[in-house]
UniProtKB/Swiss-Prot annotation:
Catalyzes the conversion of N-acetyl-diaminopimelate to diaminopimelate and acetate. One of its GO terms (biological process) is diaminopimelate biosynthetic process. This is N-acetyldiaminopimelate deacetylase. Its EC number is 3.5.1.47.
Amino acid sequence: MVVSKFVQIRRDLHKIPEIGFKEWKTQRYILDYIGTLSNEHVEVKVWRTGVIVKVKGKNPEKVIGYRADIDGLPITEETGYEFASVHEGMMHACGHDLHTTIGLGLLTAAVTERIDDDLVFLFQPAEEGPGGALPMLESEELKEWKPNIILGLHIAPEYPVGTIATKEGLLFANTSELYVDLKGKGGHAAYPHTANDMIVAASHLVTQLQSVISRNVNPLDSAVITIGKITGGTVQNIIAEKSRLEGTIRTLSVESMSRVKSRIEGIVAGIEASFQCEAIIDYGAMYHQVYNHEALTREFMQFVSEQTDMKVITCTEAMTGEDFGYMLQEIPGFMFWLGVNSEYGLHHAKLKPDEEAIEKAIVFLDQYVKWKGTRK
């Protein structure tokens, strides 16, 4: 079987997933590929483990940006691919290998046939954490080439190949990490009255946090508190002196995020009093909601529907988090879902996107960029 150039690029990238701000091999691969496109109209900057590329237009009046995240996840792959990850315990389980490949494909098309406007490609590290969009946006490297319009995509396993899905306005939720450290008093399991058990305290905290969603958030809004990890204790017959909860908060409104955090802090204070312990809350990284520019999104959806072979679906907002939201705070633009028809979902060890989606995306995005690049 002969695979296309860009399918092979995706497979190469899939083998070398790297976590946030450690994407050195991925960066090197991107730079090496760009080197094969050697062209007097192409300029390249390196920012940390990311890459920023500018393709100079023939008669530029604006700058159109395309953002692709490049990092992987700390997940042990179970796809059975011949080109599976060679980095133990790491995987491209969120499709960033496809995002990057599509970006390189669009870049190739832009170099081959230049448009009037400048194009800037942002190969961004650390979307999965601790967050690369905001520091890249604030960097001196990008300020000089800051786009006037920006777009990004995310693969969607639930949609068939040949479809995109998006909407005007709110697309993805506000997100925040949540870490709570509890410290009490350890002791012998036979003498619980002499200790303050942090396993019990953590258990109470987990259940009480769920009341925030059902009783403190407007039912017409949406919010999620998920505790994904609890650690504490050493052996079975010692009462745990410490425990730690790790989770995530998702809300569709900024106001709800503030309300949820306020209630979490109140509940944690109650746990401190009830169990005579100390508690520290850390919200870690927080991502701003992805809010699509209404007019640009409407124009994009109409163009794709009327002038390409892709099917357009108007979707509902999702509780997914994306640091691309920070870019959309500063730059008008939009994000959309790209259908890849996978039985398994995002962040799953068996995620297998249909590679046919890669070239379809490159083709229709090239059509859109060329069209947009001729409009004033």
